[in-house]
Structure formats: structure tokens, C-alpha cells
Amino acid sequence: PGIYYGIAHDKLGKRLFSCTVIPNRGAWLEYETDSNDVFYVRVDRTRKVPITVLIRALGVSSNAEIVELFGEEPKILASFTKDTSTNYQEGLLELYKKIRPGEPLAVENAESLIMSMFFDPRRYDLAKVGRYKFNKKLALRSRIRNQILAEDVVDPSTGEILAEKGTTVTLELADKIQNAAVPYVWIQTEERNVKVLSNLMVDLKAWVDAVSYTHLTLP
């Protein structure tokens, strides 16, 4: 169990990305991009759908909400062009058709299926080793280290500015940002600013110590 990445190339040399989330028990999630930058997902080895279908089915409904969550990520924007759904219910039913082809379409049935597939610990479990690998690869600190901040980073608990725009993120600063449970960080790249989402996993001791200190010092 765990999360695994791959990079291939099309005939013109364009990089194609893939990712597989393998649980100890339950449905696989397989992600891939194509030559047109469309981002697809396969749920439990079924036919692929645009990633935005799955995002809608998980409750982030409209295009505007998806862009607000992920930023203007080109692969998300390209996926909109292949996504016939426009809201939560349509996304849910579109995904249900791929997982249970031929069965009667009903929102209640689709909701029940998604809940049982991914939110029932008896049917979906990464196990400790899978969770460890997942958190290690998706840790915020490793994804923002040595990057340049595109916006100020603010502690969500205190409102304190942890780092200013233009700062290069050291390992120490990356640890500080991660352990403050900052939900996302904007970084600069040559092409554009990128929103890096956190998995919100913190060093428990560091986070508890920081919260306790804040509560003791606040008037």
C-alpha cells in the first residue's frame, strides 16, 4: 500500500504524469495526464473520467469552487473541457456510471457507493504502512523546500506572518510552516504561481506545544 508516481513521454517528448494510490484494502485510484494536459482518474480499475468528475462527486461542486481550491492549474482547466458534468449531482452520477455501468442512476445509490468505497474503514484502509508512505510523499515541507514564496504565509491559528512573499523556503522554515497546519502555500515558478496544498499532517509535539504557547500568551 502507498502512493506511487510515474513519468512517461508522448511521441513529441511531452511529459505525461501518472499516480496510483494503492490501499491495503479497497479501491485503487489511478491518475494520469494526456498529451493535451487533461487530467484523468480511474476508480477501481474502471474507465477513466476527468479528474473534475471525481472532485465534484466528493463535494466540490462548481468550476469556480474547484478553481478556488486548486488555483488556475492548467491541467484542471483542461479537464473542464472534457467534463460534461457541472455540479455535485451530475459528477456523482457520471462517476457512478463508470463504476456501476448498466445500473439505474440514482443520486442516493451513488452517494452510498462513494461513502462505502472510500469512507468506510471496513472497506477502505491504507493501513499504517500505506498511511506512512502517503504522508511522507505528500508532506508539505518537502514540496515547498527551496521554493520561493509567491505570497505571505500566515499561521491560521494566530494570524502571524510566518514568512513573507519572496522568501526562499529553508528546511527549517518548511518545518515551521508544515507544523503550523497551514492549508496551502503559493510558490513561484518560471511559468506561473502554483498553489501547493497541504495534507495537514503535523509533528504532533510541535503543534501541541505551539498551540499551548499561544493559548498561554493570548490576553
Short names for language-model regions:
Residues 1-216:
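N-terminal non-catalytic structural scaffold regions of very large proteins
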